[in-house]
Amino acid sequence: MKNRNINNHDNWETPAYIYDELNKEFNFDFDPCPICFDEITPDKDGLLIEWGQRNFVNPPYSRKLKEAFVKKAIEESKKGKLCVCLLPVSTSTILFHDYILPNAYDIRFLRGRVKFIGYNTFGEKVDNKAGMHDSMVVIFK
């Protein structure tokens, strides 16, 4: 399977200051959306495999993948698993009103914009200085 993220700029890393703070609180044991520039095989595809008990989820933000990972997080939470999702704030969407609001245990809106880490056209690691959008942490359990 081709890497579904590499060509549409979905490979942005979570800054350590956000992950570390959340990990202190939740003690994650799995990340279904790690940065991956290689081929995503079925045994590594976060949409196909079983998740851990305490999951950190910063999904690709393209619409279809974001929706798929939110729905998978809800599905996993119904099995008694914790899923902490870092998502763009988009409160007018069907995803927010029909999936996130009715299923979220908690929603935390972050102050300021997150400066995600990615790679420029020269392959150099950079952050997006201004942040692209507001962010929220959505907890499903």
Residue locations for each model-derived region?
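Class I S-adenosyl-L-methionine-dependent methyltransferase catalytic core
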Residues: M1-K141
